Regions:
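TPR/TPR-like (Sel1-like) alpha-helical repeat modules
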Residues: 59-75, 256-264, 282
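Short coil/turn linking the two alpha-helices of tandem helical-hairpin repeats
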Residues: 16-19, 48-56, 85-92, 118-127, ...
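Alpha-helical protein-protein interaction modules
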Residues: 168-169, 175, 184-283
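N-terminal leader/linker segments that initiate helical-solenoid repeat arrays
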Residues: 1-53, 57-65, 76-79
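Helix-turn-helix repeat elements of alpha-solenoid scaffolds
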Residues: 12-25, 56-65, 87-99, 122-130, ...
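Flexible helix-coil transition and linker loops at the boundaries of alpha-helical arrays
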Residues: 26-38, 67-86, 99-112, 138-146, ...
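"A position-specific structural signal for the A-helix of alpha-solenoid helical repeats
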Residues: 42, 46-49, 83, 116, ...
Length: 283
């Protein structure tokens, strides 16, 4: 059994809009036919949307039991790439779900299953999550999205580990590889903006400057996109902070003012003297 990608994601999201009475009907359908994939997918979406961030409850337990079914029967289900652990955490099914993923990744499996398992392990064991995505990249080296995910995971671990510079450097390398392979211009610009931030954080100012210049150049043809406008805001902010790092206050003000124009309220909330100075300069 292998669900269609579009149907699975669409049906999962359609579960967000279910009423309690509609949910009851679908639960009856699943009780009569455990292989009612569409009904079960919609139910998983319903419980994830409504109870994913709640504390333990009967409804959350029911939702987690549907997730367990998918891990046991359709571990390549697309919605398992989402942060489903929000629904399964602290439920009776969670240990069984973890055991199922452990068994799956210990045997030969696809890059899709490795990615889904990595999403589950991310909050529990982020280093294991990284290992799984690294394995997925080796299996599917042309998949640009896996490289983006790997970069995000390195950055996630960098925020939690003492050896921050090592993981930031790895995140930069993975993101560079992703940008090289990504063909969608808007996604590429967003990734370049992130690369500029990471390069500056790892004190690689030449790469940060190069990334800012490339991102701003590519963005000229895509100014109508909100996503691109957000990326330009990030690029101009990073550009301003680079100038501050170099002690060039006048150019920093110009860049930060340009960033401010892209958003009604610029966000310079990160810790550090440069961010504090950036806020002071724009008062």
């Amino acid at each position: 059994m292998s669900p269609d990608f579009t149907i699975s994601i669409d049906e999962f999201h359609s579960g967000f809009r279910l009423s309690e009475s509609e949910t009851a009907v679908l639960e009856l359908q699943v009780a009569k036919d455990s292989d009612a994939v569409r009904a079960r997918t919609m139910l998983a979406g319903y419980y994830f949307h409504k109870f994913g961030r709640s504390s333990s409850s009967t409804n959350k337990n029911i939702g987690a039991s549907h997730v367990l079914w998918f891990v046991q029967n359709l571990p390549d289900t697309p919605f398992l790439k989402l942060p489903i652990y929000l629904l399964t955490a602290d439920t009776p099914s969670d240990e069984a779900i973890q055991n199922e993923w452990q068994l799956l990744v210990a045997s030969e499996c696809s890059s899709t299953i490795l990615e889904n398992a990595a999403q589950y392990f991310k909050p529990k064991n982020p280093n294991k999550s990284i290992s799984l995505i690294e394995q997925a990249v080796r299996l599917d080296p042309t998949n640009a999205r896996l490289l983006e995910l790997l970069s995000d995971l390195y950055a996630y671990v960098a925020a939690k580990e003492l050896e921050t510079d090592i993981y930031v450097s790895k995140s930069v390398s993975a993101l560079e590889a992703y940008i090289y392979k990504e063909e969608n211009t808007q996604r590429k610009i967003t990734a370049i903006a992130r690369l500029a931030e990471l390069a500056r954080e790892s004190h690689n100012l030449p790469l940060a400057k190069q990334s800012v210049a490339l991102g701003l150049e590519l963005s000229q043809a895509k100014l109508e996109s909100k996503i691109t406008i957000d990326a330009i805001h990030s690029l101009q902010t990073t550009r301003g902070l680079i100038f501050l790092d170099e002690g060039n206050v006048s150019e920093a003000v110009k860049a930060l003012e340009s960033s401010k124009k892209k958003k009604k309220t610029p966000v310079f909330s990160s810790f550090g003297p440069q961010f504090a100075l950036a806020n002071e300069l724009l008062k």
